[in-house]
């Protein structure tokens, strides 16, 4: 399946483009006000004491700036940043090589930390807690364990699936931050800032139009900005107005809700093939030819957040918003929690279906 334009997952093109527009300081970090304020306090206090910052766990949907925040943490602390990921650290020796090369107070960023192997995770525990590395030398009866002292460091772990972290690992993070989807106002500021760095002429209304269709995700906003820039360069006078952005994004099949063909296919499958649900995620994945993990991590979070899809103990259900989106009448159902299809809106004091 071709890569979606509005997928929140990063690509190599995204990494190269995002590097030039990535903020380096918390003062330039747009959105997530609670996270920003807390990190300003924690970083300032650690810097004033000359100590390593407590280990930080950052979780939330992909594309919201977990990697960016790790870069900012290292930059604000004035230390080096070492980057790795859970799948890459296959053996304890891989982790040991990283840890023994850290300088005091350095930041080690581990993306997809929920994918660490159990044997590597066991080595990480004493490193996080006591700044010590347990190494086993030899094999069998002759094997012996030695301890290596490590410089104080900060582990920044990032994950889209915090629920998959083991309790011992999760409990060793002194700072836990959840990143939320961005509102249109913050995304508009992000688009305007990126356009300024890239030298793109953009009107406020054009930036807002891109922001509205970016699914609350900065990575998608920056990607759409680059594509709309291309359209404006060839089809317009190089200036991104709201009309130019609207035409470009319609051409790219990104509608006013930020949905693309995959979103519409999922919602229609729930409505037409499963009578609005509930439907299990495995059945839904088979119906649309997509992997379960992609549905859970990439497609459905935004649909749920926007109120088009509902996750229940019995499976996924389409909401009245989904029916209205397709111009379909919502069925009258009984026993649906939360008055899903809006019976209370129909007036009368009864509020019954």
Curated annotation (Swiss-Prot):
Signal peptide: none annotated. ATP binds at residues 21-22, 63, 66-68, 129-131, 172, 182, 219. Pfam families: AAA_lid_4 (PF17864), RuvB_C (PF05491), RuvB_N (PF05496). Residues 1-182 are annotated as: Large ATPase domain (RuvB-L). It catalyses: ATP + H2O = ADP + phosphate + H(+). GO terms for biological process: DNA recombination; DNA repair. Keywords: ATP-binding, Cytoplasm, DNA damage, DNA recombination, DNA repair, DNA-binding, Hydrolase, Nucleotide-binding. SMART domains: AAA. Residues 256-353 are annotated as: Head domain (RuvB-H). Its main location: cytoplasm. Belongs to the RuvB family. Homohexamer. Forms an RuvA(8)-RuvB(12)-Holliday junction (HJ) complex. HJ DNA is sandwiched between 2 RuvA tetramers; dsDNA enters through RuvA and exits via RuvB. An RuvB hexamer assembles on each DNA strand where it exits the tetramer. Each RuvB hexamer is contacted by two RuvA subunits (via domain III) on 2 adjacent RuvB subunits; this complex drives branch migration. In the full resolvosome a probable DNA-RuvA(4)-RuvB(12)-RuvC(2) complex forms which resolves the HJ. This is Holliday junction branch migration complex subunit RuvB. The lineage of its organism: Bacteria, Pseudomonadati, Pseudomonadota, Gammaproteobacteria, Chromatiales.
